[in-house]
Amino acid sequence: MIKLGIVMDPIANINIKKDSSFAMLLEAQRRGYELHYMEMGDLYLINGEARAHTRTLNVKQNYEEWFSFVGEQDLPLADLDVILMRKDPPFDTEFIYATYILERAEEKGTLIVNKPQSLRDCNEKLFTAWFSDLTPETLVTRNKAQLKAFWEKHSDIILKPLDGMGGASIFRVKEGDPNLGVIAETLTEHGTCYCMAQNYLPAIKDGDKRVLVVDGEPVPYCLARIPQGGETRGNLAAGGRGEPRPLTESDWKIARQIGPTLKEKGLIFVGLDIIGDRLTEINVTSPTCIREIEAEFPVSITGMLMDAIEARLQQQ
């Protein structure tokens, strides 16, 4: 029997209709895995050994009562076959410390999804720089004068922090906007923090597409998140409307170009953000949108994921 651990935000607070981690747990349980639930505070290191307080978990598709704990134990993380690291951002120092603990278990043979080193290496905004032929024009800087020059060149730009999620602190600055200076000061914290600028992509009106990639293989359907009511942001957390769709030819091209690098880096479950035919982000920490896509199309993304995990476990 495969022992699967998951590190996530409190399961009591999730919306099971939309929660991808919950979808993963349902599929793992359907396959007879033993589920071990952990929150960040349950992980610890003792004399170099990664351990955790885990609670054995049952889940069910019930909106009133979707989980129950059936046991608890303190164990070495190496006792688990696989651990899903599904803690939502912020990607802060606490998150980084947790990846070091998980890495100690990985060294003892536990499969960590996604690979701890790659979680640290692949910032969701900056990692797109390795695929610059696929992205919009992109500037990463702390320098207000550089941001101003970029804006003057493109006249309509998007500014965002490197550590945001859910569309937080994303600004559109159009030609003639008097607020560029204060936005630049806010995002760079007066020149002490990097931010990202990209030329505005009018294709956002048709949606910001979330394309999921499982161990290098693109899922054939995506979720387009369409901005509502004059918004620039399509993020569901910012009020965007989700519309599942088949991948376009350019979606396939982008996902297939990036897929081998993701697989090589142990990034087994990844969400690409694509606007039109441009890659804007590579989400590696806790990608979502499984449930919305599975509800609309005949595809089991969680099945693809568990198949990939089982294949990797057999290779070890």
Curated annotation (Swiss-Prot):
It catalyses: gamma-L-glutamyl-L-cysteine + glycine + ATP = glutathione + ADP + phosphate + H(+). Residues 125-310 form the ATP-grasp domain. Binds 1 Mg(2+) or Mn(2+) ion per subunit. GO terms for cellular component: cytoplasm. InterPro entries: ATP-grasp (IPR011761), ATP_grasp_subdomain_1 (IPR013815), Glut_synth_pro (IPR006284), GSHS_ATP-bd (IPR004218), GSHS_N (IPR004215), PreATP-grasp_dom_sf (IPR016185). Keywords: ATP-binding, Glutathione biosynthesis, Ligase, Magnesium, Manganese, Metal-binding, Nucleotide-binding. ATP binds at residues 151-207. Pfam families: GSH-S_ATP (PF02955), GSH-S_N (PF02951). Pathway: Sulfur metabolism; glutathione biosynthesis; glutathione from L-cysteine and L-glutamate: step 2/2. Its EC number is 6.3.2.3. GO terms for molecular function: ATP binding; glutathione synthase activity; metal ion binding. Belongs to the prokaryotic GSH synthase family. NCBIfam families: glut_syn (TIGR01380), PRK05246.1 (NF003573). PANTHER family: GLUTATHIONE SYNTHETASE, RIBOSOMAL PROTEIN S6 MODIFICATION PROTEIN. This is Glutathione synthetase. It comes from Shigella flexneri.
